[in-house]
Amino acid sequence: MAARAQAWLFAAALVIFHGSEYVLAAAFHGRRNVTATSLLISKQYVLAMSFAMLEHLTEALLFPELKEYWFVSYVGLVMVIIGEVIRKLAVVTAGRSFTHVIRIHYEDQHKLITHGVYRLMRHPGYSGFLIWAVGTQVMLCNPLSTVAFTLVLWRFFSKRIPYEEFFLRQFFGREYEEYAQKVHSGLPFIE
């Protein structure tokens, strides 16, 4: 797979991921409740993706042989697809209970979701995003960004999950405790 094809697949993955996040947020929460932040694009995210493209372009120009490992690119593409599917299954399964912002106050529509993909992991949205994001870098054959994305995202989720679960335990009590004991978080080394 040529460097140009890798870059086009990367662009397509970004458009599909963010476009579908926005569409699903609008479908479950109404268009009035959806803002540009529903696209999940922050300054840090733009910086990370810009670094990834800079790495890809620099390596394609200076070390083009790094971009010729087609089997690595295909593994990355499979990761992108798997991550996207897991993430979207999480969103669709949770429906209105899935939000991009951690809720710190209980609301009547809150439900503990333990069926579907949530039977397999407590945080399929995070797991899917991690697989998707790292997959984009594997697909680009970006060694630096692959390692950086893995470490930064793991660190981010290792802090976000306990914070979110503090509130889930407040909202759902014993029911959440039992669920958490039976079902893994979905991310390695994060209980």
Curated annotation (Swiss-Prot):
Gene Ontology MF: a single term: protein C-terminal S-isoprenylcysteine carboxyl O-methyltransferase activity
Gene this protein is translated from: ICMT
Alphabetical keyword list: Endoplasmic reticulum, Membrane, Methyltransferase, S-adenosyl-L-methionine, Transferase, Transmembrane, Transmembrane helix
Transmembrane annotation, as ranges: 8-28, 45-65, 66-86, 129-149
Topology term for the membrane: Multi-pass membrane protein
Cofactor: binding details: Divalent metal cations. Probably Zn(2+).
Biological role: Catalyzes the post-translational methylation of isoprenylated C-terminal cysteine residues. Carboxyl methylation is a reversible and potentially regulated step in the post-translational modification of prenylated proteins.
Catalysis performed (reactions): [protein]-C-terminal S-[(2E,6E)-farnesyl]-L-cysteine + S-adenosyl-L-methionine = [protein]-C-terminal S-[(2E,6E)-farnesyl]-L-cysteine methyl ester + S-adenosyl-L-homocysteine
Any one cellular-component term (Gene Ontology): endoplasmic reticulum
Name of this protein: Probable protein-S-isoprenylcysteine O-methyltransferase
Lineage: Eukaryota, Viridiplantae, Streptophyta, Embryophyta, Tracheophyta
Enzyme Commission no: 2.1.1.100
Amino acids binding substrate: 160
Requisite cofactors: Zn(2+)
Residues reported in the UniProt entry to bind S-adenosyl-L-methionine: 110-113, 118, 123-126, 164
GO biological process terms, semicolon-separated: methylation
Family membership: Belongs to the class VI-like SAM-binding methyltransferase superfamily. Isoprenylcysteine carboxyl methyltransferase family.
Subcellular location: Endoplasmic reticulum membrane
Source organism superkingdom: Eukaryota
